[in-house]
């Protein structure tokens, strides 16, 4: 095909191809530089004592175990609350809602909420959950704020996954006498589970990397608390702790060490999402 091109068109095609490769190379180089720089500055400080210890200005020790646990608490609580809401809303919008105008309005609202800066969710969460409902800054207020923030993402990703299921599957199940819910439960959801799981894992990644919404709602506490105590006690996550140490003079190396841990977690979460989605899609295709 390229042999039939004129020299001018061939030169233009070569120039555009080179430009595309250059853009791709610069993007990869920037990503590798960012990861390498963070690991170079922070990874030497990631020790077992750093991961399993607690911070104390009196003893002059630094540890991020409380922040790791607070992050885990918020991830578990937020996902436990948002999954039934998000998946249920997506099933209703895709399978049950009859008024398309209402569906389009809700879809527009979810897309709009997805684009709102997270700091605004944090401000609203502080005013409503912390002050109005008197929950105090802690894991519970932070989790509820994140539920509101990531709910549109769960709804949209689940909707898109449900829409990929062929309509013939639904018609076949209904023709065999299955009820509406039985058809959704036994036919639609199993064929859409790969996209739903991938969306949930990516939502976990967003929770782990969130800081702005938690500054006002989860607090800055670096104290080790159990789950029940942390619900209503100031509990800094890894990202909030990174912010605290980055603004503390002389603690920049600690901030880079936390950034290294967060970078590893992000890479693991994204890799898990990719592998899980691929495996579930492969298993779904072989059934």
Language model feature labels by segment:
Residues 117, 176-177, 190:
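Glycine/proline-centered hinge or cleavage motifs at structural transition points of membrane proteins
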Residues 2-22, 37-78, 99, 244-253:
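Periplasmic/extracellular loop-to-transmembrane helix junction in inner-membrane transport proteins
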Residues 78-110, 123, 273-282:
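Transmembrane-helix boundary motif in ABC transporter permease subunits
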Residues 55-62, 214-263:
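Interhelical loop and adjacent transmembrane-helix boundary motif
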Residues 111-148:
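Generic hydrophobic transmembrane alpha-helix motif, especially the helices
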Residues 93, 159, 163, 201, ...:
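C-terminal transmembrane helix and the adjacent membrane-cytosol boundary/short C-terminal tail
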Residues 79, 158, 180-218:
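Transmembrane alpha-helices
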Residues 69, 73-81, 85, 89, ...:
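Hydrophobic alpha-helical transmembrane segments of multipass integral membrane proteins
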